[in-house]
Amino acid sequence: MADPKHQYTAAVVTVSDSCSRGEREDRSGPAVSQLLEQFKFSVVVREVVPDDQIQIQSLLIRLAREARLVVTTGGTGVAPRDVTPEATAAVCDRLLDGVAERMRSEGLKKTPFAALSRGVCGARGQALILNLPGSPAGAVESLQAVTGLLPHALDLLIGKTEHT
């Protein structure tokens, strides 16, 4: 359940073979969690999962029932085991292409490699699933690019459609 000072719940998933095996410390998940807390999200779950599409899909389905926002970090590039976008698209009812486009657009201002990110954003029921790059800086910068959109998108998903 969300802390009273927080309006929305969030789950953070680090997708990384090496982190899931304990060979590397997860730095992206904690960085993303910290930023979400600053924006008044209550991070209720943090998980680390290997780059396995079926495992990612199963986890996203479960977390979309537990949190309004599910943020993944990692597995969005072009390497053979980067399957986070495929897993996300497979479990979403609708994709929000503009959100991913905004993240890439902002990322391109810092590095040309942002063009290689295949991250997507989509809705599953009343939850939003957002893919971020695996590097701590890339994950934080991508999330910062869309934090202003998230509350409105989450409100729309529960039917709050009044416009002021």
Where are these regions (language model features)?
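Non-catalytic beta/alpha edge segments that cap or flank active sites
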Residues: 1-164
